[in-house]
Curated annotation (Swiss-Prot):
Membrane-spanning parts: 16-36, 42-62, 64-84, 117-137
PANTHER family tied to this protein: MARVEL DOMAIN, MARVEL DOMAIN-CONTAINING PROTEIN
Start-end of Basic and acidic residues biased regions: 206-219
Membrane topology recorded in Swiss-Prot or TrEMBL: Multi-pass membrane protein
Record keyword rRNA-binding present: no
Alphabetic keyword roster: Membrane, Transmembrane, Transmembrane helix, Vacuole
Acidic residues composition-biased segments: 191-203
Protein's name according to its UniProt entry: Uncharacterized vacuolar membrane protein YNR061C
Length: 219
């Protein structure tokens, strides 16, 4: 009984850590995107995974044990992907050399993204632990119901395939929206660059006029 209580408490502690880090990652990814003038798919991936995890924690108590195990596997894969992609892009990047402007701050976004790498790595490890715990729970319930381990694994694989298919369908539907956002942000950035270039040209023209006027007056 003591062992069961200790295991339950440990599992709930892991859940609280996962929830806290997911919310932290959600805030960091949001700030990184806000301070980044352009659309960054890697930062958006981190934000999307954080939202998925937050929703998952809200409904996990209503899910059956087998579906929880499948969702734990999916969460582990998602956090591993988010962690690896974020670390590969921002891990070795020098943030101090990146430009800053009135409407954008690449340097600040880079620094926030670097900080965000650690929570994502920890979340990946925590989900590995809860995935294993969920697997043990599924096996114990299967033994109580007289089911074999093989049948349980087959059911898990089928549920996992269905979940992956649904995620792929959702991602395919969201790609056109992301492409439109990328085009819009690229257009806005181009217009800002053109405006700044026109301002510089006008300033140079005014300066040349002043110089020409000074020369004529001297003559």
């Amino acid at each position: 009984m003591l062992k069961l209580t200790t295991t339950s408490v440990t599992f709930h502690v892991l859940r609280y850590f996962q929830l806290g880090l997911s919310v932290t990652n959600l805030l960091l990814a949001s700030f990184a995107i806000i301070t980044n003038y352009k659309v960054d798919r890697i930062l958006r991936l981190s934000l999307a995974v954080s939202i998925i995890s937050s929703v998952y924690f809200g409904i996990v108590r209503f899910l059956p044990v087998l579906l929880i195990f499948v969702m734990e596997i999916v969460q582990t894969v998602l956090w591993f992907t988010a962690f690896v992609t974020l670390a590969s892009k921002f891990g070795s990047m020098s943030c101090s050399s990146m430009p800053r402007g009135i409407n954008f701050d690449y340097s600040g976004s880079c620094k926030i993204a670097k900080i965000d790498i650690l929570p994502e790595a920890v979340l990946f490890i925590l989900f590995l632990a809860t995935t294993y715990a969920s697997y043990i729970t599924v096996l114990s319930q299967a033994k109580e119901n007289g089911s074999s381990t093989r049948s349980v694994l087959k059911a898990c694989v089928k549920a996992l395939r269905d979940t992956v298919d649904r995620l792929e369908t959702s991602l395919e539907e969201s790609e056109p929206l992301l492409d439109l956002e990328v085009q819009e942000d690229a257009r806005t950035e181009t217009e800002s660059i053109e405006d700044s270039t026109d301002s510089e040209d006008n300033a140079n023209i005014e300066q040349e006029k002043v110089i020409d006027g000074s020369i004529e007056h001297s003559s």
